[in-house]
């Protein structure tokens, strides 16, 4: 899709770098884009994006397309680096810790008090910035009048990168912890900081502690995870929220929960928007599309709440969502076929949870589900970013490693919208295990497209805040909610429910997972949220449309070609050892050269290994390298991070190493090794 670049705005834009003082004297690095009229005579509302990702380089290309656009439409748009990151002073902390959130409140107060500010602020962001926008809204700072949160979560334990269904999310807990260790090791930029950069860097390095330690120390939903989880008290959010997600983003269920639990009307209402997108802003044009004019859509939100203009945002349905038409399996889709629908309430009057008994249940006895441990190698990327190998390929191989229940071919089309639920009667002979359920769209040619899935750690079946081991030999009924989805099954296709006892590397295998478990089909069912267009009132509502994507002029960043680039995603089988290895290049950025002369190179490789019959053989490894170079200053810094995780029945074992060099001289090296008791995950 073509993305229009806009160079002419209603207002000319002024860009300025600032240091924002915190109550303890620490200064946070900020960049503000303001309309040229902004001042005491013509104050403007302020928008804040607050991230740890380095505004002077890492997010600079994205920032250049968004913040000047808002400024050109009459807002002061501000990007701030979190304490201890980028060119901000102080030491790095944990995700969304108390210091970060207290600083965020102070930043909003400072921005509201500036002579060019009306005193009304809005906050927006994707992922981390979407998280802390919600978290700060729950603190109800006086100036915060509106929020746009994109691809974020209301539940830090069960809907983030650490745990899923009570199980350790092996694929992303480790990868993200290693990424953060590499990111936290980056120095300030001497072009912006001057000679103090080296002392600041040394202080940051000495304060490092791998976050994987903390995350594995908290294997159930305790107070650590409740901090920053706005689902603990939705009523604390006192600002209007536009919640945005994509069906191919792991955080999409947060949008469904927010539109259910936040008020539809009043002084702080919510509106939800879920498209076909991955973990990206909806206007970037990255697969899967279609992209939308997201900046224009958010401008309507800001103008309504920060300028008191009637833009019609409250006349929109509570939830606007994309329902994808059936499509052949592929690892990337430039655009998906489908349509936009609107629902005035959530749960919607147009959606009915319909029970589907398992096929053949009347004549079937207990069925053993005992999957090989490499089931899951075709799961696709947990965080799709629009890369060529992100999405799950044809699921037939995964289905062959699972127990599948195929329904009869549909006599007529069937649309679902929401979160399917699977109810199972299980018998397990071991105390620990996990259930993975997938719903697939099976075409007449046999191809199997993943529609949605879900995970349950059986020891978390009575709640994510407790561990209840299974009594060997006992039979119990369990339920698991699958991820939300909007999907249209066509007539002639089959719906498939696939059950497995392993899903590597998404789920770290439990010690007894090789034993599997038995399911009683006659006492089990699949519940589907079936949407009826008539009951939903589609014909009575104007068609849902969006403008074409539009952005400010892109930053002139050069990306030199890298010869011999390795594949993004490779599955290797060692036949003699019966071992499977998944190698992933997350494509974080390669080499780029910025207009100010900075050369920035990143490389990452993730490796996930497991034996087909041995859950104790699971191993994850992450290798990171970063180089920052300014030839005109003689500045050349290199960072290397290596980390591994293994586990047995009793403990997780972690190993992390950080090595930093200035030029050819090593200036820092530290290694951490820990054994962490395996209490739940």
Where are the regions that the model predicts?
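Glycine-rich nucleophile elbow surrounding the catalytic serine of serine-hydrolase chemistry
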Residues: 126-135
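Cap/lid segment of the alpha/beta-hydrolase catalytic domain
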Residues: 37-112, 161-162, 437-445, 504
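Active-site-adjacent alpha-helix of alpha/beta-hydrolase-fold enzymes
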Residues: 253-270
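C-terminal, loop-rich substrate-recognition/catalytic regions characterized by aromatic stacking residues
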Residues: 273, 281, 287-661, 665-681
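Short beta-strand/loop motif that positions the catalytic acidic residue
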Residues: 237, 243-245
